[in-house]
Amino acid sequence: MQVTVEKKEGIHCSLLIEVPANEIDSVVSKEINRTAKTIKMDGFRPGKVPAGMVKKKYGEQIRMEVISDLIPQKYSKAIQDEKLAVAGIEVELKENKEGQPLKFVANLELFPEFEVTGFEKIEVQKPVVELTDKEVKQMIENLRKQFATFSEVDKVVEKDDKVTIDFVGKKDGEAFEGGTANDIDVIIGSGQMIPGFEDGIIGMKKGEQKTITVTFPQDYQNKDLAEAETTFDITVKKIQQAELPEVNDEFVKKFGVKGGVDTFENEIKENMQRELKFILQRKVKDQVFKGLREIAEFETPKSLIKREIDAAKQNLLKQMGGAKGFDVNQLPDNLFEANAKQKVETSLILDSIMNSQEFKAEEAEVESLLDELVQAYEEPEKTKEQIKKNDKEIANLKALVIENKLTDWVLEQAKVTEKTEDFFEVIKENMQAQQAGF
């Protein structure tokens, strides 16, 4: 086999590979003879079909099957010999004739080689959130609202009321698509409608009609409406007032708590603290990764981005329960491209840093992280034992420990400031970020 490096520019490289004719023809001949012994053909007894007849009828097909098997073997050997770190490959067949060398080009995308410097340029705003009894009481109040019962009342609309409404949305005086609905239930203050909509209903009475003006958010999914000033003609058809359950032993049993109200309140606070810790870690880590992407200079292999896009599509299909009749591949790649590119770049950067630094996940550190994570489950010890039996899960935990160490290492060199934030705003932002990332 002869290998010629045709061109190597940045992360792109082409290998011209030539396989001697006798090697190809020998394998093809053996395959034809093997086929002749098993194939059934009219006029011949089984195993007695002449090889020449097989070659005449199936020779081209057999040759292509042989080549399809041989090409990956040959380019894999060439890549190994040339010591290339390949991210993606496309094969272009050049010459394929009996009695002549097989020639093909392997167009390669390589993993970029780069060093990350300038960590001091990274700016991170570290959120500081104080979790007090006030936030715990508010969380319990939110849980009470989830179990609220509603009864119709004759009064003006107030916060936390459930109202049944009709509305017609208009932009520049014309009704827009998706902006009209009838008999829609809205809980005032829930945030289920765009900002300003629910506030505009407060003070209205049953049977009252009113036109309100609201501006759609900048990041609204329908770009034709993003930042657009619109009007909504609203009719209130029913007003219902919420009746919240008392926080007693019967109420806390709905959440699987057996120790009474005090135990319930303690568990709520612990859950809030645990969730807050992970969210704040994620917020800081996201800023660190964003900063790393900004200072690192390299070309991102498109094949890796495409691979990540395909994985994101399959993950979406899985989240939808493998929806029958839905072809996820019909979704355009650009819906997933930005997130996919970020993931690939972040992964390449972290790998580059870890190659130059010695971050290790000690067994005690993995155990500590596992202990912390399983507290979110109903049966922590049982869950812990199940995870410890799963090699893949343990590998993921080790990777997370190393990732956390790397993040702390970058933070020691970055410009870090602190910003006080509200607990519920942080939770809301986290939910929005998760939804935006599919």
UniProtKB/Swiss-Prot annotation:
- What is the reaction catalyzed? [protein]-peptidylproline (omega=180) = [protein]-peptidylproline (omega=0)
Gene3D superfamilies registered for this protein in UniProt: 3.10.50.40, Trigger factor ribosome-binding domain, Trigger factor, C-terminal domain
Molecular functions per Gene Ontology: peptidyl-prolyl cis-trans isomerase activity; protein folding chaperone; ribosome binding
InterPro entries attached to this UniProt entry: PPIase_dom_sf, PPIase_FKBP_dom, Trig_fac, Trigger_fac_C, Trigger_fac_C_sf, Trigger_fac_ribosome-bd_bac, Trigger_fac_ribosome-bd_sf, Trigger_fact/SurA_dom_sf
Q: Which Pfam families match?
A: FKBP_C, Trigger_C, Trigger_N
The PPIase FKBP-type domain sits at 160-245
Q: Where found?
A: Cytoplasm
Output the GO biological process annotations, alphabetical, semicolon-separated.
'de novo' cotranslational protein folding; cell division; chaperone-mediated protein folding; protein transport; protein unfolding
The EC number(s) attached to this protein equal 5.2.1.8
Q: Please indicate if the UniProt record lists Chaperone as a keyword.
A: yes
A Gene Ontology term for the protein's cellular component: cytoplasm
What keyword terms does UniProt attach to this protein?
Cell cycle, Cell division, Chaperone, Cytoplasm, Isomerase, Rotamase
According to its UniProt record, which protein family does this protein belong to? Belongs to the FKBP-type PPIase family. Tig subfamily.
Q: Which NCBIfam families match?
A: tig (TIGR00115)
According to its record, what is known about the domains?
Answer: Consists of 3 domains; the N-terminus binds the ribosome, the middle domain has PPIase activity, while the C-terminus has intrinsic chaperone activity on its own.
* General function of this protein: Involved in protein export. Acts as a chaperone by maintaining the newly synthesized protein in an open conformation. Functions as a peptidyl-prolyl cis-trans isomerase.
The name of this protein is Trigger factor
Q: Which organism is it from?
A: Francisella tularensis subsp. tularensis (strain WY96-3418)
The organism's taxonomic lineage, starting at the top: Bacteria, Pseudomonadati, Pseudomonadota, Gammaproteobacteria, Thiotrichales
What gene makes this protein?
A: tig
